[in-house]
């Protein structure tokens, strides 16, 4: 294969801070939206989109920044220790599965189905016509891990936690708003098609455990964009902006139904080329007029 062909067949991806990058060579397989509780926790989003390729066509750069959390032998999730973006980790059957939200270009592949819809977030509705499977689709022989256990809900309190359980938080009262954001920073930070964020008054959120396990990365050139994550497992966690009096909560981190659903899509001008918005929520190229 000539150098020009090699470039054409490769897709480049990177984490939010840029310290970890990777090249993934096609052909690609099994691009899917996963709704399992573990993906939701890890990414902080309603679902995670992954794409598979042969491991010998995968090249990772910046491995020194990568942290892997392994809840049990043979199962791990990897993330950038500086910014918290999810990055490709362990291989499966000669394949590496990469989060699609980190692509710098269009891989040319499109999601084929939704998996683990039996674990779907109660605040998210699947609006497209792709096939849906309660767990893995037929023909995929892989271990099915149970969703993280949950204790009974408490009236008036919305709880959340990271995937490993080191960090937990509670929110008193209703949120201010909830939106789906498609900006490039949110896609890189969450390693997903979009972020689903909920804003709450800063003094209504409290961390009940793991406050010392939180890392916050602020994009240097951004006025206010930052990502907070668990240093142990990399899960996206609420980011508190004290000067603005708000906390931005990744809805995938919630353990209880928040009593609200995202009201609109913002920054759709930056939408991932491989993702189609199929619902009827209002769409805004950038911030909504009332922001």
What are these regions (language model features)?
Residues 2-161, 166-291:
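A short Gly-Trp-Pro
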């Amino acid at each position: 294969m000539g150098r020009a062909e090699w470039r054409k067949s490769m897709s480049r991806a990177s984490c939010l801070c840029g310290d970890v990058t990777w090249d993934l060579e096609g052909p690609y397989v099994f691009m899917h939206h996963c709704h399992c509780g573990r993906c939701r926790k890890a990414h902080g989003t309603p679902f995670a989109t992954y794409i598979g390729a042969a491991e010998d066509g995968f090249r990772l750069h910046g491995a020194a920044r990568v942290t892997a959390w392994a809840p049990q032998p043979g199962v791990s999730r990897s993330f950038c220790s500086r910014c918290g973006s999810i990055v490709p980790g362990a291989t499966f059957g000669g394949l590496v599965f990469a989060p699609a939200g980190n692509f710098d270009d269009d891989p040319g592949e499109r999601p084929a189905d939704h998996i683990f819809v039996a674990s779907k977030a109660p605040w998210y509705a699947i609006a497209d016509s792709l096939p849906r499977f309660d767990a893995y689709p037929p023909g995929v022989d892989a271990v099915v891990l149970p969703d993280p256990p949950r204790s009974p809900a408490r009236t008036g309190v919305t709880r959340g936690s990271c995937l490993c359980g080191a960090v937990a938080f509670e929110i008193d009262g209703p949120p201010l708003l909830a939106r789906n954001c498609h900006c490039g920073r949110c896609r890189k930070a969450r390693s997903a098609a979009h972020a689903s964020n909920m804003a709450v008054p800063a003094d209504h959120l409290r961390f009940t455990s793991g406050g010392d396990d939180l890392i916050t990365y602020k994009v240097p050139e951004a006025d206010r964009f930052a990502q907070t994550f668990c240093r142990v497992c990399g899960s996206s966690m609420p980011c508190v902006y004290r000067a603005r009096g708000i906390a931005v909560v990744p809805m995938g981190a919630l353990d209880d139904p928040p009593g609200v659903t995202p009201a609109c899509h913002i920054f759709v001008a930056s939408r991932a080329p491989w993702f189609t918005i199929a619902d009827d929520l209002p769409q805004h190229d950038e911030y909504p007029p009332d922001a």
